[in-house]
């Protein structure tokens, strides 16, 4: 309204001097309580641990109500909604040519991890590899060790059982790793200290039935971690679950013929 003062009031009130005063800009609608709670954790997942148990539980309930994309780029689970809510789904990996990737990996003294996809929903596994590498959102897969992106540490062969389309990456300096053993202990403490929040998480979780998939990802991210490692020791084929692609340096190279017994590439 303010920018149209001349046409709205020019025939009277404009001739005397300073012209019509600009109308005040309309006030933005007040945020709801749910919106305020969600705003606190966006980019700051640890904020939920500073809330009262009731506020944290209500935040979990609010997350469970959030919309997700329905074009196949996101998963219809609580973990996907949670990673969206804290801003983890939007980050991207460092993506390098294969030669630059190998130089960076050797300099960092890291081991390649392998992720495999299969054809699904009318799209090829290669399409999903590309989404992981450079898509504007991350698909949070289901799994026993937390919802996120699953990798086989140091074993292309172990990864191949999940699809013949394969990509690779290593954990960079932004990775913060926590083990499932640590999360189990953390979960027992959390459920005792935050019973309402824990109950809300149990109610909200979807994925692998009665597993701690939702609790693992929630606890890891809220305590400052973005990678979950199965068990306390890494051996070839150990499951690694990334919650945030910024923890990854990836090669642009992909393959379409992954199979059991293959060598690492």
Predicted region positions:
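Short, polar loop motifs at secondary-structure junctions
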Residues: 155-157
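Intrinsically disordered, low-complexity segments
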Residues: 1-26
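Gram-negative host-targeted secretion-system effectors, predominantly Type III and Type IV
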Residues: 27-35
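Active-site and NAD+-binding cores of ADP-ribose-processing enzymes
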Residues: 34-150, 161-265
């Amino acid at each position: 309204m303010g920018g149209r003062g001349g046409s709205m009031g020019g025939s009277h009130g404009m001739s005397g001097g300073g012209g019509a005063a600009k109308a005040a800009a309309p006030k933005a609608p007040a945020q709801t309580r749910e919106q305020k709670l969600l705003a606190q954790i966006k980019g700051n997942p640890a904020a939920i641990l500073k809330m009262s148990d009731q506020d944290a539980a209500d935040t979990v309930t609010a997350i469970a109500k959030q919309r997700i994309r329905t074009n196949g780029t996101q998963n219809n689970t609580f973990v996907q909604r949670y990673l969206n809510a804290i801003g983890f789904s939007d980050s991207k990996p460092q993506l390098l040519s294969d030669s630059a990737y190998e130089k960076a990996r050797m300099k960092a003294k890291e081991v390649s991890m392998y992720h495999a996809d299969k054809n699904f929903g009318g799209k090829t596994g290669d399409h999903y590899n590309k989404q992981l590498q450079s898509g504007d959102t991350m698909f949070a897969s289901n799994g026993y060790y937390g919802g996120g992106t699953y990798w086989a540490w140091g074993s292309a062969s172990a990864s191949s059982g999940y699809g013949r389309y394969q990509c690779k990456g290593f954990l960079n300096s932004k990775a913060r790793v926590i083990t499932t053993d640590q999360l189990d202990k953390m979960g027992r403490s959390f459920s005792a200290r935050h019973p309402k929040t824990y109950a809300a998480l149990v109610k909200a979780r979807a994925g692998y039935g009665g597993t701690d998939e939702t609790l693992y990802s929630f606890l890891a991210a809220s305590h400052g971690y973005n990678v979950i490692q199965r068990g306390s020791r890494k051996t070839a084929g150990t499951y690694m679950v990334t919650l945030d692609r910024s923890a990854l340096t990836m090669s642009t190279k992909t393959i379409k013929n992954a199979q059991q017994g293959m060598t690492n590439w």
